[in-house]
Amino acid sequence: MAAWSNTRALGLSRVPRQTPRARLRLLSRAGEGAPVPLFLPLVLALAAGIEALDVAEFLRNPTKLAKGLQALHQALRADGITCGCGASLEMEALGAELDWKVYPPRVVAPPPALLSLDPANIAERVSRAARIVAAVDATRRLAATAPGEPALVVALTGPGSLSAQMARAIGSEPAIPLSPTAPLLEIAGRTVLEVARLFLLAGANVVILLERDRPAAEIAISETWASVVTPISNLARFHKALPIMLTTPDATPLPPAIVPCYPAAAIPEDGGRRPRALALGVDQLDWRLPKAEAAVLTTDGELPVDTDISALRVACQAVEAELDRMTATGK
């Protein structure tokens, strides 16, 4: 573990902070950041071990899901609880067949009649998807019962990345191009919008779009991408939630409502005042607080399901100790 500063070594006691949801309300105001960054690591399937369940079964059981996530949150003491996190969630909701021998599960067959789906079809499929139904139910329970007002986080596959998944899944058909197209982007965007809507109605406070396949600005479909992302960010803002996009800095400009999130190792020199999120790597737990200012600290994906919880707890405590130091010293 890195030699992090900690409150005891500095002669500091644990410093009271506003609740995570109160700090989120500050962030939701245009251009206003919270005094101390929110720490929101993406941890979901790891809680299956607490409930001694297979991951696939755990993610479909709302009672076990809510209980396991609350227990994991109490162990890690981060600022948020991850209620949903990618892992082909959206593809499965549309009807894709997944291989659950591994986690995250792999898509082995595309959703039926994918290219003929309209908004009503998409909304219906999403509303009946077992994993989404369980996660939304768990979100609703945690919103009502989790002590300390933790932020409730849902991390969804971004429209660009989801359309790329769709293209790969149907790429074995000769008539279908392997690269994402405008129609696929529109289907992907509507799918993410409908999934986000359900979580927001249940009480989610943060929507993170995992968007590694964001189209470059000069690509023709970049306008389509912007047109499907904007409603998602606007919906989050309508529900007083914070929309964040984990992506790379060198692609299509983001809608103004979205908080950009970049890997901590590749921070752009944008010089702007816009609140920014930074992502710590999940491939190792030797986390070091970035020198750049950030409104939110998260991770660049979901923590692996085989992560040692004790080691993760130590890593989270180190981050929280550094945030305590920042609170105490005003730095």
Question: What are these language model-derived features?
Answer:
Residues 4-46, 136-148, 183:
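N-terminal amphipathic alpha-helix/helix-capping segment at the start of soluble metabolic enzymes
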Residues 6-11, 23, 50, 237-331:
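Catalytic-face loop-and-helix region of soluble metabolic enzyme cores
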Residues 33-37, 77-80, 147-152, 203-205, ...:
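Short, well-ordered coil/turn segments that N-cap beta-strands
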Residues 67-86, 194-206:
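Catalytic domains of carbohydrate-active enzymes, especially glycoside hydrolases
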Residues 80-102, 119-128, 204-223, 301:
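Glycine-rich, proline-tolerant flexible connector loops at the mouths of alpha/beta enzymes
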